[in-house]
UniProtKB/Swiss-Prot annotation:
Catalyzed chemical reaction(s): L-methionine(out) + ATP + H2O = L-methionine(in) + ADP + phosphate + H(+); D-methionine(out) + ATP + H2O = D-methionine(in) + ADP + phosphate + H(+)
Keyword Cell membrane: yes
This protein's name: Methionine import ATP-binding protein MetN 3
Function in brief: Part of the ABC transporter complex MetNIQ involved in methionine import. Responsible for energy coupling to the transport system.
Membrane topology (UniProt): Peripheral membrane protein
Any coiled-coil regions, as ranges: none
Pfam families, alphabetized: ABC_tran, NIL
GO molecular function: ABC-type D-methionine transporter activity; ATP binding; ATP hydrolysis activity
Residue stretches making up the ABC transporter domain: 2-241
UniProt entry keywords in alphabetical sequence: Amino-acid transport, ATP-binding, Cell membrane, Membrane, Nucleotide-binding, Translocase, Transport
Subunit structure: The complex is composed of two ATP-binding proteins (MetN), two transmembrane proteins (MetI) and a solute-binding protein (MetQ).
UniProt GO cellular component terms: plasma membrane
Species classification: Bacteria, Bacillati, Bacillota, Bacilli, Bacillales
Record family assignment: Belongs to the ABC transporter superfamily. Methionine importer (TC 3.A.1.24) family.
């Protein structure tokens, strides 16, 4: 569906060239929700603007739906852009137009007749949950409602791809989840390919099928979300995953408990998918003559399944502890020893 091949974007500056995107290679399948995560300055905003040619690549090739979009210009490019919707962090609405008029705007530009425009706007208002707000102005809307207008406007021309540029960064956590649920629903209903950029791992966890991690203009890691959670390879990816699996309070609690109970071993168990539902600790206590204390645990739901983490203190004879660890491995649960007694 979307293919980036050796794509590079270099900006000219007085201080010298700035490479915002450095030889990016990506393949995004039709109908998936693909996330790009990175800290500020990683190059993710420059990357997503290459998809619809708001920015032109310095080199490389971008193909969307079998069309090399990086090689077209003029009316052909304008037509191609109608198949690529985009929403923004700060909504970019026309403040002098009502909700209906904002949604209708791209249809006017495309030359759609008035009756068809009215029907399409009605469909979109219903789709994004803005019934009764069609005559309101942006200044009368909440942040979440403004973004719903932005989504409806982006979908007006029935695009194949929806680009989301930090679409939830300006929203509170509850509204963020509501917008993410809406995007997930739209993806399932319409089979729409969604590409989003964010600095929040929560966004990736909640709706993405796959993720690419960017750092200093480079894509340093790519994979299914669950695989990245289970086995992050790069240091930056590990930091993002720890946003969800750890916290400073949790780490301080574990450290204090390790000091309080210096004997035995402290282990971290990671559960992926169906493994979350296995009675691992129950089996452990049934077959081992050791004491088992749970220090910390959490479960996160991703778009591909569940991910769980459990920190446990094992106390007893060294041989019994080792046998218990081997038994956990047999249950196909990933294990890391984080403290030795």
């Amino acid at each position: 569906m979307i293919l980036l091949e050796n794509v590079k974007k270099i900006y000219k500056a007085k201080s010298g060239d700035v490479t915002a995107v450095d030889n990016a290679n990506l393949k995004i399948e039709k109908g998936e929700i693909f996330g790009v995560i990175g800290y500020s300055g990683a190059g993710k905003s420059s990357l997503i603007r290459l998809f619809n040619q708001l920015e032109k690549p310095t080199s490389g090739q971008i193909t969307i739906a079998n069309r090399v979009i990086s090689a077209i210009t003029g009316s052909e490019l304008r037509k191609a852009r109608q198949e690529i919707g985009m929403i923004f962090q700060h909504f970019n609405l026309l403040w002098s137009r009502t909700v209906r008029e904002n949604i209708e705007f791209p249809l006017e530009i495309a030359g759609v007749d008035k009756a068809k425009r009215r029907k399409r706007v009605d469909e979109l208002i219903h789709l994004v949950g803005l019934e009764g707000r069609g005559d309101a102005y942006p200044s009368q809307l909440s942040g979440g409602q403004k973004q719903r207008v932005g989504i409806a406007r982006a979908l007006a021309n029935n695009p194949q791809v929806l680009l989301c540029d930090e679409a939830t960064s300006a929203l509170d956590p509850e509204t963020t989840d509501q917008i993410l649920d809406l995007l997930l629903d739209i993806n399932k209903r319409l089979g729409l390919t969604i590409v989003l950029i964010t600095h929040e791992m929560h966004v990736i966890r909640k709706i993405c099928n796959r993720v690419a991690v960017m750092e200093k203009g480079k894509i340093v890691e790519t994979g299914p979300v669950l695989d990245v959670f289970r086995n992050p390879k790069q240091d930056i990816t590990k930091r993002f995953v720890q946003q969800l699996t750890d916290s400073e309070d949790t780490n301080e609690t574990i450290e204090s408990l390790i000091e309080k109970y210096p004997d035995g071993k402290v282990i971290r168990l990671q559960f992926i998918g169906e493994a979350v539902e296995r009675p691992v600790l129950q089996r452990l206590m049934q077959r081992s003559d050791i004491e088992v204390s749970i220090l910390q645990g959490n479960i996160a739901q991703t778009n591909n399944g569940s991910y769980g983490s459990l920190v446990v203190h094992l106390n007893g004879e060294e041989t019994a502890i080792q046998q218990a660890i081997e038994g956990i491995h047999q249950d196909q649960v990933e294990l890391e020893v984080i403290a030795h007694g």
